[in-house]
Amino acid sequence: MVKIKNIEEIVQNSEVLYNEPLRKYSFTKTGGNAEVLVKLTNEQDLQNVIKYSNENSIELTILGNGSNVLISDNGIAGIVAITSDMNKIELLDGDVISCYAGLTLKELTDFCIENNLTNLEFSCGIPGSVGGAIFMNAGAYGGEMKEVVQKVEVFTKAGEKKIYTNEQMEFSYRHSVIQETKEIISRVYFQMKKGTKEEIISKVEELNKMRSDKQPLEYPSCGSVFKRPEGYFAGKLIQDAGLQGLTVGGAQVSKKHAGFMVNIDSATCEDYKNLIKEVQKKVLEDSGVELECEVKILGE
């Protein structure tokens, strides 16, 4: 393992922590420690950390809001850079929103309401960051990020800035080209439309109610665990296989919504991984459908 040293010298306004528990930054409240954790506050520090990692052959893991990931119980070696404090947002000419990758989707939705901008209401309850949402082409209730993204700024592994148009992002279901290039999203531009505040608020409230009625928001979870198989719904397949309430350690298939796995009693990442495997196995036996994970597993 390469010794990580002098990293404080390359960041100006970002905190550096050693052997930091990552469960504090995970929606599932699971995971071991980060060898080194950098709490990024600005784009320059992000670029410096990327260059430092590349030049010193150190593994770099980017973590946004920690909502669609499972973090290994063994933690993550190398550097973990958290973008949640990189959250500046502004309104540009032509109803374009510019924001950094660490902004939460709730903060983005609130900004849209404040400025009477529509078309992002679908994202109001997705518990993620803008960067993660673009990486996964997140969507809900009939909307997807690909419908509103104008362009995306990224850093290459060498720390060079690059811009992708919407078309170049190659968006598809829970996919963007960044999953192949392994580049790091820094800033996103959204092409919005003017709306009326009352209608936007009404839509957001409607979707939030639907979410709270159907989803197990009272427990820590990583959100929807599996991608939607073509022609099916993952939650329905799991429910039909009689797996609601299935528990491994402290992780459980939600009794409220079978597409979710919740932490009901100090679950570990290993509990989640074993529960995922068991559900995949039993759904395949029951319906012949192979469930593919939407959740990303970080660390070894």
Positions of the model-derived regions?
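Structural signature of FAD isoalloxazine-binding scaffolds in flavoprotein oxidoreductases
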Residues: 31-32, 37-43, 70-88, 135-166, ...
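Anion-binding (especially nucleotide phosphate/pyrophosphate-binding) glycine-rich loop
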Residues: 2-130
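Short, basic and Ser/Thr-rich N-terminal targeting/leader segments
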Residues: 56, 63-65, 148, 219-220, ...
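A gly/ser-rich beta-alpha-beta helix-loop segment of oxidoreductase catalytic cores
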Residues: 113-150, 221
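Phosphate/pyrophosphate- and phosphate-bearing ligand-binding catalytic cores of soluble enzymes
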Residues: 17-18, 155-157, 161-274, 278-282, ...
